[in-house]
Regions:
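Phosphate-moiety recognition in structured ligand-binding domains
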Residues: 4-7, 133, 265, 270-276, ...
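Conserved phosphate/anionic-ligand binding catalytic regions in large, soluble enzymes, centered on
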Residues: 6, 54-55, 212, 309
Length: 339
């Protein structure tokens, strides 16, 4: 097995501060104003779908849009469930490669059948998706060699947070850099512990972080992993908790008064709890079995969540290497999925 720094996935994870800074340094205004549309749909597959959900959350909260993230395949096979003919509607189509079949087809249906305006978002000029949209947003700086999406996710998400009027996203690169230096060794140590199951939890913006964290672990390790909204997990899914379970809770300051109760409840059911968050109550941090705690001078939870994604990416990488997997080329996966 190669050394850690010989994997392109590792290089792309630790390059995130520089990639994000480079993207933010050259951003201009969005080519279209989402607030001028009655309906805004965002679509993609895999990580691009979770990226869409993250952006929809931020736009609804900070711009007042009526945005919804929908899998590309749903728009292809069930368009009338989502498209509303007659609305002034906008579709943002996300695909890292620009060659994901479902996403390109969804964009074409939106234009040809629904009369929507389409923004194509990808990393490759001249790709299939790049040629379809009325507007194009290109991120060639974060073209990735690895099958799994890491720095491209962070950089594109950061750009859209900036376009959500969250200027503080410009503060993230040095904060992420500092965290990588401080926490990498502990993340690697955590990856050596054998847990029977891993569940990521988060609320608000952190729910989208939990989903992307879950996908990174599934992709790189091939192991079953779950993601839920923090409080929804208590309504049925908590039945799976037992000794040998790890609950990785991304704590949201907006529901900080209930974090201690959540942690205690999961521990009472036999699970270990790792809590990660910014400016969280000391009682919650002390109650958890382990924690990654930050004291960042940030105002918005959407920015905080993006700043913590690298922790889950690193965990997935180190866990995969520990299991003898190749995180650059995970089993059963390809870089581009075509239908």
């Amino acid at each position: 097995m190669k050394k850690t720094d010989e994997f392109v996935t590792y290089s792309e994870i630790i390059n995130q501060p520089r990639a994000l800074e480079e993207i933010l340094s050259r951003l201009e205004e969005l080519p279209v104003d989402p607030t001028q549309f009655d309906q805004v749909l965002l679509t993609g597959c895999g990580s691009s779908l979770f990226l869409s959900g993250w952006i929809a959350h931020a736009w609804n909260k900070h711009l007042g849009t009526r945005a919804l993230a929908v899998p590309s395949s749903e728009l292809i096979f069930h368009p009338r469930s989502y498209f509303r003919p007659g609305d002034r509607a906008l579709l943002l189509a996300f695909s890292r490669s620009g060659e994901t079949t479902e996403t390109s087809r969804a964009a074409r249906i939106a234009i040809d059948d629904m009369g929507m305006k389409v923004v194509s978002v990808n990393c490759y000029p001249g790709s299939t998706l790049d040629k379809i949209g009325h507007y194009r947003l290109l991120f060639p700086e974060v073209q990735e060699k690895s099958v799994v999406m890491t720095q491209a996710f962070s950089a594109i998400a950061g750009a859209f947070l900036y376009w959500s009027k969250l200027d503080e996203v410009r503060a993230l690169p040095p904060l992420i850099e500092e965290s990588l230096t401080k926490n990498e060794e502990e993340i690697e140590e955590l990856s050596t512990i054998e847990f029977e199951q891993l569940i990521f939890l988060g609320s608000g913006a952190f729910a989208h972080l939990a989903s992307e964290a879950m996908l990174k672990v599934k992709e790189m390790t091939g192991k079953p992993t779950e993601a839920w909204q923090s409080f929804e997990f208590r309504h049925g899914p908590r039945a799976i908790l037992r000794p040998g379970s790890l609950v990785w809770l991304f704590g949201n300051r907006e529901d900080k008064d209930h974090l201690l109760d959540l942690i205690s409840e999961f521990q009472d059911l036999g699970a270990e709890v790792c809590i990660t968050g910014n400016q969280l109550p000391k009682e919650a941090l002390n109650q958890a079995d382990r924690s990654f705690s930050f004291d960042w001078p940030l105002q918005y939870t959407e920015t905080e969540a993006l700043g913590m994604l690298h922790l889950a990416q690193l965990y997935a990488f180190f866990r995969a290497v520990r299991l003898g997997k190749n995180p650059d080329k995970p089993d059963k996966l390809t870089k581009v999925v075509k239908l």
